[in-house]
Amino acid sequence: MKDIPVYRFPAEHARENGELELYRASNKASAACKEAIEKAISEHYCDNVLHREAVAQVAEQFGHERILYVLAITIRQKDWDGRFSADNKQWAKAVPVAENPDAWGTDRNCYLAVNSHSGLVDLFTKLAREDARAHERRPSVLVRLKSRPPEAAAEGVKKAKEPSL
């Protein structure tokens, strides 16, 4: 589900623009991501420690963008909950999430809110944000090699062959 893009517009926008299939696929992936986060927290919380493997497990399946989107929705939906850190609340407010009202005025995003203990969701959010930043900063070796000009790459090879005294 990593390849399904996050659709950030409400259902009405999708309907008006002929993008209902994209909206539904994204919403389905986000709901599955929510469930995967709940499962990962349950499986990786032991001895009062939430292990980083929880984030890695979900990121492998859904990618960081969707995880962070679902977590931002969760924190916004539970803004009243003091167990979320001020830092995570501020971050969640900065993530672009459109209100998605149904025919009765209920925000459909409430169905994407993670239902694990808020303190653990806060910790999972902190770990997920750190993990996402770490992955942003580390370009692959292939990307780094492709971005180097040919002269610099050849220069690096020459230097490696020269014996040092």
What do the PLM-derived regions correspond to, one by one?
Residues 1-164:
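Gram-negative host-targeted secretion-system effectors, predominantly Type III and Type IV
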